[in-house]
Amino acid sequence: MVPTVWNEDADSMNQYSETFLDHYRRPRNLGDLVDSDAVAIVHNEICGDVLRVAIAVEPDTEAERRRIIAIRFKAYGCAATIAVASVISEMVVGKRVADIDGIDNDDVVAALDGLPAGRIHAVVLGRTALREAIARLS
């Protein structure tokens, strides 16, 4: 999967912050993670967006102490899905798995310097994919 081409007119681009546009145009952590510990694929049945998230964690005998050491994503979706997945991927590297639930929608929106209300579905999709990947850790 690769990011989709977003065919929006210039006026619609004005509703997004420079931070958002940077993450959309140059997504961080895009691609495959060969040595992943867990993978999740989630689908938004309303808009059709699909997001695949793969994570690798440091080994530790206590699950709650493990830290995310790498994350990669692939997205088929709108610009918001791509930008959100990119910013979430930056937010979680180095964090303990137990602390990930502390990241909420507002944190993601703030990291993007704002997001139109009509695009919040992308934040929900991104957080859901991450939570599902974490749930698949053994």
Question: Which residues make up each language-model segment?
Answer:
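C-terminal binding/interaction regions
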Residues: 3-31, 39-40, 95-99, 103-138
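Structured beta-strand/loop patches that form or line metal/cofactor-binding pockets in enzymes
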Residues: 22-70
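Short intrinsically disordered, low-complexity coil segments enriched in acidic
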Residues: 1-3, 81
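Glutamate identity and glutamate-enriched acidic tracts
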Residues: 8, 18, 45, 58, ...
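Active-site- and interface-proximal helix/loop "cap" or "latch" segments in soluble metabolic
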Residues: 56-62, 66-124
